């Protein structure tokens, strides 16, 4: 695990971090910018892109903290297909009960509610060649100092230690900063239909 630097440190995520994951996911959900005004329910993005990983793949969930405050996370799964099956069985039914009666009032509401009602991959077809996937989000205050790189490296090391051969992740085409970040780390960019993905083989890691 990376050392503490300037009071920041990376640690395994814990159940007590759930609220922080919901919050960070929301305030970075607009192509890296704050999406608070785009959702009527602030937990909607986290239901999809953050919290289920802590619940169903806790070995692959890490947070960046400053003192006792969580300021970023990286979450993932070594086996996308198995993870999706577990969510279909044990996660989405719970979420649907929690948001029962919620009527979408924004375009983003509608997008996430559709995804919850009919779960689907944002990068379809990649899981056969690149079975793992991940998500990372960091608050603006902690986006310098190389912490994003260290968090990705922490995740890739964990995946590699479990024999995972390759990983993929989806990126909003509008998020130019994220695209530059992944290119710099050695990920390969793939246009996959209407989706943009970055992939890496873990038998020859670039970082």
Map each language-model feature to its residues.
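Conserved GNAT acetyl-CoA-binding A-motif
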Residues: 130-132, 159-171
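Conserved beta-strand in the GNAT
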Residues: 63, 69-78
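Conserved acyl-donor/pantetheine-binding loop and adjacent beta-alpha core of acyl/acetyltransferases
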Residues: 81-135
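Conserved catalytic-core motifs of GNAT/GCN5-like acyltransferases
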Residues: 81, 168-171, 179, 183, ...
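Conserved acetyl-CoA-binding loop-helix of GNAT-fold acetyltransferases
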Residues: 135, 144-158, 180-184
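Conserved GNAT-fold acetyl-CoA-binding loop/helix
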Residues: 29-49, 86-96
